[in-house]
Amino acid sequence: MPAGGFVVGDGQKAYPGKLTPFVLFTCVVAAMGGLIFGYDIGISGGVTSMPSFLKRFFPSVYRKQQEDASTNQYCQYDSPTLTMFTSSLYLAALISSLVASTVTRKFGRRLSMLFGGILFCAGALINGFAKHVWMLIVGRILLGFGIGFANQAVPLYLSEMAPYKYRGALNIGFQLSITIGILVAEVLNYFFAKIKGGWGWRLSLGGAVVPALIITIGSLVLPDTPNSMIERGQHEEAKTKLRRIRGVDDVSQEFDDLVAASKESQSIEHPWRNLLRRKYRPHLTMAVMIPFFQQLTGINVIMFYAPVLFNTIGFTTDASLMSAVVTGSVNVAATLVSIYGVDRWGRRFLFLEGGTQMLICQAVVAACIGAKFGVDGTPGELPKWYAIVVVTFICIYVAGFAWSWGPLGWLVPSEIFPLEIRSAAQSITVSVNMIFTFIIAQIFLTMLCHLKFGLFLVFAFFVVVMSIFVYIFLPETKGIPIEEMGQVWRSHWYWSRFVEDGEYGNALEMGKNSNQAGTKHV
């Protein structure tokens, strides 16, 4: 059976342009939107392993921790209230991403980023001053609203601002910011946990104000994308901005294509309903399946619950937080590898290599934990070398994710949608991501209690399934201009039956013909 298709040669446009300091600055600032998501992932798992935090808000979990070593280690964190604390954010992000789609389309990408920063800042302040569990959950819900807006707008912003030759690397800046946010949070957790008096968790949770202010202030100074400006009728300003972004005077070909795509977009009255049309079947499939599979790698439970997990396998609180810092450092370093390789090696290669690496590591970790913990979850005293082996393979697993499904799970969906469905489709991507992050966060601690080490084998099974899916159905998108992506689907062995020549890209043909007519006239 043929694998994914590749588009090369004749039909492909090459818009003029270079990587200017201006576009680099705007993409770096916009990518900082990932800090708020990453900081939350890193900070929450850390504070839930701090005894003072658990004693104040989740006393039943704290009491389980204080029991002797005969306690089933798999089940010591199984608490409905603790689960609600962690997972409420993702449900809120799901709801806000649906609203953010309309805001992003009608008012621009920048305004959505601004809303995201403000809402996240409010949630961080409530959590930092929380005195009751309900305050923690309200704060988490506001954090989720902020993340929903930011995750909707930032990947679109980066894909639209970046020159097509550098789109992969610049878009992965979002994932790099997520990993940096995770690492910073884990380092802060390690030091704040040592504060006498047991109030360090307040600094950890309240510290989320800093990344929130970065994206809030950043969104005030950033320009909107030419695509978004054209979509809102600001043609002259968009052309001027496009010249500055690309660093060349002749942007007529790209501009005409953007205008043509915008005209087709404006002819669509119901973008949500339009997503169900046959010609958008490949886009809708990827918008759903890529974020679905991204969460079923198990990465968020590893990063989110890393301190809890390391505590479970025999580390002290300090050692578990430090081990989480190590995995966070690996996460950042491996994401840099992805930035280097995504526009050289392609998306498919990284997806498949990362999947293979994660599969091997999950099998090894399951075997190691199963051999020592058995099914009753009472390992006794773990040798230091044994714990180091487990952490090493978890780090290799994190690296495999960080240069594959981590960044590409945001990059590929954001670059494959035509303008007329782009905002709605990106909202689907964010919503699916948050739905399954919520579900997995909701059931992870219970699954760990019941499936024990077999939980890692469940995630390993899904890694096999998703790798097969990528091999068969995902075409290579490296080096294709964002408004020319229709070629990818028309050339694919399977998706070509849904996306026919006469059915897709008519607006771009109009733009091409308009550009040629203008050239002849001159």
UniProtKB/Swiss-Prot annotation:
Residues annotated with Phosphoserine modification: S252
UniProt-listed Pfam families: Sugar_tr
Mitochondrion listed as a keyword: no
GO cellular component: extracellular region; plant-type vacuole; plasma membrane; plasmodesma
Transmembrane segments: 23-43, 80-100, 118-138, 141-161, 172-192, 203-223, 290-310, 322-342, 349-369, 385-405, 428-448, 453-473
Topological region Extracellular: 44-79, 139-140, 193-202, 311-321, 370-384, 449-452
Induction remarks: Strong increase at the onset of the dark period followed by a progressive decrease. Transient increase at midday.
Parts of the chain on the Cytoplasmic side: 1-22, 101-117, 162-171, 224-289, 343-348, 406-427, 474-522
Coiled-coil features, chain-numbered ranges: none
Primary localization: membrane
Tissue-by-tissue expression: Mostly expressed in young leaves, especially in guard cells (at protein level). Also present in roots.
Assigned keywords, A-Z: Cell membrane, Membrane, Phosphoprotein, Sugar transport, Symport, Transmembrane, Transmembrane helix, Transport
Superkingdom per UniProt: Eukaryota
InterPro entries recorded: MFS_dom, MFS_STP/MST-like_plant, MFS_sugar_transport-like, MFS_trans_sf, STP/PLT_plant, Sugar/inositol_transpt, Sugar_transporter_CS
GO BP term (any one): monosaccharide transmembrane transport
GO molecular function, one term: symporter activity
Membrane topology, from the record: Multi-pass membrane protein
Signal peptide: none
Family per record: Belongs to the major facilitator superfamily. Sugar transporter (TC 2.A.1.1) family.
NCBIfam families: SP
Known role: Major hexose transporter. Mediates an active uptake of hexoses, by sugar/hydrogen symport. Can transport glucose, 3-O-methylglucose, fructose, xylose, mannose, galactose, fucose, 2-deoxyglucose and arabinose. Confers sensitivity to galactose in seedlings.
Name of the molecule in the record: Sugar transport protein 1
